[in-house]
């Protein structure tokens, strides 16, 4: 089974992957997954909203957009001490990567010193760090890299062809430019998309082509299933067929064999069997123990129970010789009930 990295995928061959008989597609994806990863390990991340709501963008799916009529209350930038406290709880619970998200079009220069301090403080705990702050200039990317940021998340959201139906305040090229700035600064890229936005099947193929043809490919690829939020233009859109979502995970694994494919937003709408199929298809990363702003993420004990049923262990930070299986004993109830955690579909 060929798992060589490629950056020249075309629509015809990707549509052919999506059209494979389901069992054949799953077998191909799982075989490639086993060539590159331990099939029974999942990387665990935690997300924290460091600044919530009042975003000026017009993303039609998002509760944080000031243009959408949701009940979300805006909040100011969190103090560094609060961020560090949440990161410590996440580490105790078993997360190896701490992701910090702000509802900004782009960070202002006045915000950068606080953001950089957050990165340095979380890094001092021995965790990997990730941020998603909107568009970045080259200089801002350099500053974040200098502070020690490991990953920067900036999703493409959907295909170039469907993009203007979802967002008009930021271009698709703007997103690619930010990813380029992140790469040039020396950081790892976290970039994926959202399915269930009313796109056609061809749009899912096109989105994955855009991601896989990035050179290098993103180290982390979050695949979100739309979380419908009352007050947004997509609140009443038809649900995505479960098998279409699982196929998207499998094709992403085949096209990006060395990337972590994250089963991201939308897991509360998935039963255990669907999540297990996603892991079989090659998903090997989740957001763990979080509460999303717009919908509950599965509670920590539910994830623990599912991992135990499937015989899944959690991945450790590189260089850590001990398993993080003790998350069963150290899960913290306050984190599940906290209102700080960030909407992974944003």
Curated annotation (Swiss-Prot):
It is an enzyme of class 2 (transferase). Pathway: Cofactor biosynthesis; biotin biosynthesis; biotin from 7,8-diaminononanoate: step 2/2. [4Fe-4S] cluster binds at residues 55, 59, 62. Coiled coil: none annotated. Signal peptide: none annotated. [2Fe-2S] cluster binds at residues 99, 130, 190, 262. The keyword Iron-sulfur applies. It comes from the Bacteria. Binds 1 [4Fe-4S] cluster. The cluster is coordinated with 3 cysteines and an exchangeable S-adenosyl-L-methionine. GO terms for biological process: biotin biosynthetic process. It catalyses: (4R,5S)-dethiobiotin + (sulfur carrier)-SH + 2 reduced [2Fe-2S]-[ferredoxin] + 2 S-adenosyl-L-methionine = (sulfur carrier)-H + biotin + 2 5'-deoxyadenosine + 2 L-methionine + 2 oxidized [2Fe-2S]-[ferredoxin]. Homodimer. HAMAP family: BioB (MF_01694). This is Biotin synthase. It comes from Colwellia psychrerythraea (strain 34H / ATCC BAA-681).
């Amino acid at each position: 089974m060929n798992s060589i990295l490629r950056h020249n995928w075309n629509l015809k061959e990707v549509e052919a992957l999506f059209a494979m008989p389901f069992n054949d597609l799953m077998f191909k994806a799982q075989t490639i997954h086993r060539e590159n990863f331990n099939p029974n390990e999942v990387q665990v991340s935690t997300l924290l909203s460091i600044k919530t709501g009042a975003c000026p963008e017009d993303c039609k799916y998002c509760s944080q957009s000031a243009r959408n009529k949701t009940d979300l209350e805006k909040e100011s930038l969190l103090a560094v001490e609060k961020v560090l406290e949440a990161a410590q709880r996440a580490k105790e619970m078993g997360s190896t990567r701490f992701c910090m998200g702000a509802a900004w079009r782009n960070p202002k220069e006045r915000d950068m010193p606080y953001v950089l301090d957050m990165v340095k403080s979380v890094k001092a705990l021995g965790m990997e760090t990730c941020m998603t702050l909107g568009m970045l200039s080259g200089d801002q990317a350099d500053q974040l890299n200098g502070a020690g940021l490991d990953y920067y998340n900036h999703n493409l959201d959907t295909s170039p062809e469907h993009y203007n139906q979802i967002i008009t305040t930021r271009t698709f090229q703007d997103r690619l430019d930010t990813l380029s700035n992140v790469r040039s600064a020396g950081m790892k890229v976290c970039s994926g998309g959202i399915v269930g936005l009313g796109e056609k099947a061809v749009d899912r193929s096109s989105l994955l082509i855009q991601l896989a043809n990035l050179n290098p490919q993103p180290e982390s690829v979050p695949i979100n299933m739309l979380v419908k939020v009352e007050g947004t233009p997509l609140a009443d859109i038809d649900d995505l067929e479960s098998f279409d979502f699982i196929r998207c995970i499998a094709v992403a694994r085949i096209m990006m064999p060395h990337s972590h494919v994250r089963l991201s937003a939308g897991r509360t709408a998935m039963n255990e069997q669907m999540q297990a199929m996603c892991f079989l298809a090659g998903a090997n990363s989740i957001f763990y123990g979080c509460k999303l702003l717009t919908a509950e993420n599965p509670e920590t004990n539910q994830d623990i129970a599912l991992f135990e049923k499937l015989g899944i262990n959690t991945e450790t930070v590189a260089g850590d010789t001990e398993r993080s299986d003790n998350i069963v004993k150290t899960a913290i109830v306050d984190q599940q009930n906290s209102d700080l955690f960030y909407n992974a579909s944003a």
